[in-house]
Amino acid sequence: DFFTLPENTYYVLEKDNMLVSAARLSKINDFYYLEALETPPKYRKKGYASELLNEMITHLHQQGSVDIRDCVSKTNTASLATHKKCGFFIAEENGIYYPSNTVNNKTYGMRYFIR
Protein backbone atom coordinates (compact mmCIF):
# COMPACT_ATOMS: atom_id res chain seq x y z
CA ASP A 1 0.00 0.00 0.00
CA PHE A 2 1.21 3.49 -0.89
CA PHE A 3 1.22 4.87 2.66
CA THR A 4 2.54 1.90 4.66
CA LEU A 5 6.29 2.07 4.12
CA PRO A 6 8.04 3.21 7.31
CA GLU A 7 10.51 6.08 7.48
CA ASN A 8 9.16 7.87 4.43
CA THR A 9 7.76 11.35 4.00
CA TYR A 10 4.41 11.69 2.25
CA TYR A 11 2.90 14.66 0.45
CA VAL A 12 -0.79 14.68 -0.42
CA LEU A 13 -2.84 17.05 -2.53
CA GLU A 14 -6.58 17.11 -1.90
CA LYS A 15 -9.38 18.88 -3.72
CA ASP A 16 -12.88 18.88 -2.23
CA ASN A 17 -11.72 16.35 0.39
CA MET A 18 -10.58 13.91 -2.31
CA LEU A 19 -7.00 12.74 -2.76
CA VAL A 20 -5.97 13.89 -6.24
CA SER A 21 -2.21 13.29 -6.07
CA ALA A 22 0.33 11.86 -3.62
CA ALA A 23 4.10 11.55 -3.42
CA ARG A 24 6.37 9.36 -1.31
CA LEU A 25 9.93 10.47 -0.51
CA SER A 26 12.77 8.50 1.03
CA LYS A 27 15.78 10.27 2.53
CA ILE A 28 18.95 8.56 1.30
CA ASN A 29 22.24 10.01 2.51
CA ASP A 30 22.21 13.68 1.44
CA PHE A 31 19.33 13.56 -1.07
CA TYR A 32 15.68 12.63 -1.34
CA TYR A 33 14.47 9.83 -3.59
CA LEU A 34 11.01 10.40 -5.03
CA GLU A 35 9.93 6.80 -4.84
CA ALA A 36 6.37 7.32 -6.00
CA LEU A 37 4.20 10.01 -7.54
CA GLU A 38 0.62 8.86 -7.98
CA THR A 39 -2.44 10.54 -9.43
CA PRO A 40 -5.67 8.54 -9.77
CA PRO A 41 -6.71 8.21 -13.44
CA LYS A 42 -9.80 10.42 -13.14
CA TYR A 43 -7.66 13.30 -11.83
CA ARG A 44 -4.91 13.13 -14.43
CA LYS A 45 -4.25 15.90 -16.98
CA LYS A 46 -5.47 18.56 -14.57
CA GLY A 47 -2.05 19.72 -13.33
CA TYR A 48 -2.38 18.14 -9.88
CA ALA A 49 0.91 16.21 -10.00
CA SER A 50 2.75 19.41 -10.99
CA GLU A 51 1.02 21.35 -8.23
CA LEU A 52 2.00 18.71 -5.67
CA LEU A 53 5.61 18.52 -6.87
CA ASN A 54 5.95 22.30 -6.73
CA GLU A 55 4.49 22.43 -3.20
CA MET A 56 6.81 19.61 -2.12
CA ILE A 57 9.85 21.39 -3.59
CA THR A 58 8.86 24.66 -1.88
CA HIS A 59 8.46 22.89 1.46
CA LEU A 60 11.82 21.12 1.15
CA HIS A 61 13.57 24.31 0.03
CA GLN A 62 12.33 26.11 3.15
CA GLN A 63 14.34 23.52 5.12
CA GLY A 64 17.52 24.12 3.09
CA SER A 65 19.02 22.95 -0.17
CA VAL A 66 17.05 20.47 -2.25
CA ASP A 67 18.37 17.44 -4.11
CA ILE A 68 15.62 15.10 -5.36
CA ARG A 69 16.19 12.09 -7.57
CA ASP A 70 13.64 9.91 -9.31
CA CYS A 71 13.30 7.21 -11.95
CA VAL A 72 10.74 7.78 -14.70
CA SER A 73 9.86 5.29 -17.40
CA LYS A 74 11.29 6.32 -20.76
CA THR A 75 7.86 5.68 -22.30
CA ASN A 76 5.85 7.67 -19.73
CA THR A 77 5.74 10.94 -21.64
CA ALA A 78 3.19 12.51 -19.27
CA SER A 79 5.36 11.92 -16.19
CA LEU A 80 8.50 13.07 -18.00
CA ALA A 81 6.72 16.28 -19.03
CA THR A 82 5.46 16.85 -15.48
CA HIS A 83 8.92 16.40 -14.01
CA LYS A 84 10.52 18.73 -16.57
CA LYS A 85 7.80 21.34 -16.03
CA CYS A 86 8.69 21.33 -12.32
CA GLY A 87 12.42 21.78 -12.94
CA PHE A 88 13.66 18.19 -13.05
CA PHE A 89 16.17 17.21 -15.71
CA ILE A 90 17.46 13.91 -17.07
CA ALA A 91 20.64 13.26 -15.10
CA GLU A 92 21.19 9.63 -16.11
CA GLU A 93 20.26 7.67 -19.24
CA ASN A 94 19.46 4.70 -17.00
CA GLY A 95 17.63 5.29 -13.76
CA ILE A 96 18.90 4.07 -10.42
CA TYR A 97 16.44 2.68 -7.89
CA TYR A 98 18.36 3.98 -4.89
CA PRO A 99 16.75 1.92 -2.10
CA SER A 100 18.33 -1.22 -3.61
CA ASN A 101 20.96 0.56 -5.73
CA THR A 102 19.83 -1.20 -8.91
CA VAL A 103 20.01 0.23 -12.43
CA ASN A 104 17.00 0.13 -14.75
CA ASN A 105 17.63 0.77 -18.45
CA LYS A 106 13.90 1.32 -19.04
CA THR A 107 13.90 4.47 -16.93
CA TYR A 108 15.65 7.83 -16.92
CA GLY A 109 17.34 9.06 -13.78
CA MET A 110 15.67 12.42 -13.13
CA ARG A 111 17.02 15.06 -10.77
CA TYR A 112 15.97 18.34 -9.23
CA PHE A 113 18.72 20.30 -7.54
CA ILE A 114 18.82 23.73 -5.92
CA ARG A 115 21.09 25.17 -3.23
What annotation goes with each model-predicted range?
Residues L37-K45, V72-T75:
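A short, internal acetyl-CoA/4′-phosphopantetheine-binding micro-motif in the GNAT/acyltransferase core
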Residues D1-E35, P40-P41:
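Acetyl-CoA-dependent GNAT
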Residues T39, K45-T58, A81-K85:
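Conserved acetyl-CoA-binding loop-helix of GNAT-fold acetyltransferases
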Residues L60-V72:
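Conserved GNAT acetyl-CoA-binding A-motif
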Residues S100-N101, R111-R115:
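Short beta-strand-to-coil "C-cap" segments at the C-terminal boundary of structured domains/repeats
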Residues N29-F31, D67, I96, T107:
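A generic structural signal for beta-strand entry/edge sites
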Residues N8, N105-R111:
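Short hydrophobic/aromatic beta-strand or adjacent loop that forms the aromatic wall/cage
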